[in-house]
Amino acid sequence: MAASAIQSSAFAGQTALKQRDELVRKVGVSDGRFSMRRTVKAVPQSIWYGADRPKFLGPFSEQTPSYLTGEFPGDYGWDTAGLSADPETFAKNRELEVIHSRWAMLGALGCIFPELLSKNGVQFGEAVWFKAGAQIFSEGGLDYLGNPNLVHAQSILAIWATQVVLMGLIEGYRVGGGPLGEGLDPLYPGGAFDPLGLADDPEAFAELKVKEIKNGRLAMFSMFGFFVQAIVTGKGPIENLADHIADPVANNAWAFATNFVPGK
């Protein structure tokens, strides 16, 4: 009787351990706390992923490196300099690219939209992106959207300190995995950051990742172009575009490059 009870107890213990291990395997565990994770396919069934994805090898690469397998969005198999050969460096660079892509998309919109509004009769102070911030050095200071009732800034140091604090909090929140370090993906956290549920379908989510990184790369090049335009022409992107349309021969990259004199 005692032997039967011991055997039953041992069997029950093994069953409980198996159930616990299965639960941990399904939902994950971090620092002694269980955290739910969305289950997704390892390689999405999309033309943009896998060995048969579209590739661009560039002029100096004969074949796709073995470490670029098409697992991640935006992988066209091009890495002539071998920047992604080390897995840790690759992971870090992917994170930096996605974050900078998002900032560039927001920045490009911020460079274009105020100038468009100004061209259509909306008055809110300086519309050219690289001139707007300089208003803080004027006697009247800087009014956000031209409205002194919103944010009236007169100290560049105060703006800098506020920026550091706010961005530090946001970046800490992201790197920490969400509120109280709940184990959210630092690049694609979902949840409250996806109120429309765009990532609920894994296949649609995989496609959106590709669209995001492609548009983000384009935005980074656009921002670089805006910087160069500001230095060379002293005008915003919309005004430069209007000048080019009005007189393409006199207003183009080649004409400005051949006539550009630094400091003038």
Swiss-Prot record:
Keyword NAD found: no
Binding site residues for chlorophyll a 4: 215
Binding residues annotated for chlorophyll b 3, in chain numbering: 155, 171
Binding site for chlorophyll b 5: 163, 260
Binding site for chlorophyll a 3: 135, 145, 212
Modified residues (Phosphothreonine): 39
Pfam families the record matches: Chloroa_b-bind
Listed InterPro entries: Chloro_AB-bd_pln (IPR001344), Chloroa_b-bind (IPR022796)
Amino acids binding chlorophyll a 6: 244, 253
Binding residues annotated for chlorophyll b 4, in chain numbering: 163, 174
Spans traversing the lipid bilayer: 98-118, 150-170, 218-238
Main localization of the protein described in the UniProt heading: plastid
Membrane topology reported for the UniProt record: Multi-pass membrane protein
Residues that hold chlorophyll b 1 according to the record: 56
Co-factor binding comment: Binds at least 14 chlorophylls (8 Chl-a and 6 Chl-b) and carotenoids such as lutein and neoxanthin.
Residues engaged in binding chlorophyll a 2: 100
Compartment(s) where it occurs, according to its Swiss-Prot or TrEMBL record: Plastid, Chloroplast thylakoid membrane
One GO term (biological process): photosynthesis, light harvesting
Residues noted as binding chlorophyll b 2 in the record, renumbered to the chain: 102, 151, 180
Domain notes: The N-terminus of the protein extends into the stroma where it is involved with adhesion of granal membranes and post-translational modifications; both are believed to mediate the distribution of excitation energy between photosystems I and II.
Role description: The light-harvesting complex (LHC) functions as a light receptor, it captures and delivers excitation energy to photosystems with which it is closely associated.
Family statement drawn from the similarity comment of this UniProt entry: Belongs to the light-harvesting chlorophyll a/b-binding (LHC) protein family.
Binding partners and assembly: The LHC complex consists of chlorophyll a-b binding proteins.
Name under which the protein is recorded: Chlorophyll a-b binding protein of LHCII type I, chloroplastic
Species of the source: Lemna gibba
Top-level taxonomy: Eukaryota, Viridiplantae, Streptophyta, Embryophyta, Tracheophyta
